Amino acid sequence: MSDYVYELMKQHHSVRKFKNQPLGSETVEKLVEAGQSASTSSYLQTYSIIGVEDPSIKARLKEVSGQPYVLDNGYLFVFVLDYYRHHLVDEVAASNMETSYGSAEGLLVGTIDVALVAQNMAVAAEDMGYGIVYLGSLRNDVARVREILNLPDYTFPLFGMAVGEPSDEENGSPKPRLPFKHIFHKDQYDANQHQQRKELEAYDQVVSEYYKERTNGVRTENWSQQIETFLGRKTRLDMLDELKKAGFIKR
C-alpha cells in the first residue's frame, strides 16, 4: 500500500457541511462503478444504490433523518439491501431460493455486501477531494423511507451517504480510534477483563482530551460515556418487525 493511500484512509472524517455544488453525472457513475468493484459474496451482488436528486424527495428524507445535510449536499446516495432481483429469478427457478435469502444468514451476507460497496465509494469520493457522511438516521422510520423510495419486498434501506465539496467552514478532523493492540487479537480473542478495562481507561482519556481541545473545553466526555448515552437510548426497537415485513429473517 502506498503512503498516499494509507494517509488518505487515515485522514477520513465525517463532513457535515457542503458547498452548493452538485456532483456531475459522470462523477456519480464513477463512484457507483467503484463501489461495484468491491468484493461480493458468491457473486450475489445483493445491493442497489438510489441516487436521490429530486429536492422534494430529499426534503422528505430529511424529515426522517432530522439532519440538514440530507438535503444540503452535492449528492445523496441511499444504500439498499436488495434481494428483489433474486426473488425474480426464484419465481422461475426449480428450487426454493427464498429459504436462503429470507434467512438470517441471507441478511448478514447482503448487509456485508452493501457495506463493502459503500466504503469503496467513500474512499473513491475522498480521493476525488469530496467529503462524505454516512446516514444511519434514515432508519429512524424505515416504513416511511420504503414508501418514499418505492422499495419493493425483499429490499431494505440500510443507510445513506451524503457526498460533496466540503464547505469552507468545515473543520472536521479524524477522531482517535481504539488502539491497535485493543482491537487486534492474535490467534484467539483475548477476553482478559482487567487488561481490557485498563486499555479502555487509557482510551477514554485520549478521547476526552480530543474533545476538550476541539471544543475549547465545552465537551470533555469520553468514549465510554458516549456509548453509554447512545446504547442507553434503546432506539429503533422496531427493526426486527420491519425486516420481517420486507421478507427477511423468516428463519
Swiss-Prot record:
<dbReference type="InterPro" id="IPR000415">
    <property type="entry name" value="Nitroreductase-like"/>
</dbReference>
<comment type="similarity">
    <text>Belongs to the flavin oxidoreductase frp family.</text>
</comment>
<keyword id="KW-0288">FMN</keyword>
<dbReference type="GO" id="GO:0016491">
    <property type="term" value="F:oxidoreductase activity"/>
</dbReference>
<comment type="function">
    <text>Reduces FMN, organic nitro compounds and disulfide DTNB. Involved in maintenance of the cellular redox state and the disulfide stress response.</text>
</comment>
<dbReference type="InterPro" id="IPR029479">
    <property type="entry name" value="Nitroreductase"/>
</dbReference>
<dbReference type="InterPro" id="IPR016446">
    <property type="entry name" value="Flavin_OxRdtase_Frp"/>
</dbReference>
<protein>
    <recommendedName>
        <fullName>NADPH-dependent oxidoreductase</fullName>
        <ecNumber>1.6.-.-</ecNumber>
    </recommendedName>
</protein>
<keyword id="KW-0521">NADP</keyword>
<keyword id="KW-0560">Oxidoreductase</keyword>
<dbReference type="Pfam" id="PF00881">
    <property type="entry name" value="Nitroreductase"/>
</dbReference>
<keyword id="KW-0285">Flavoprotein</keyword>
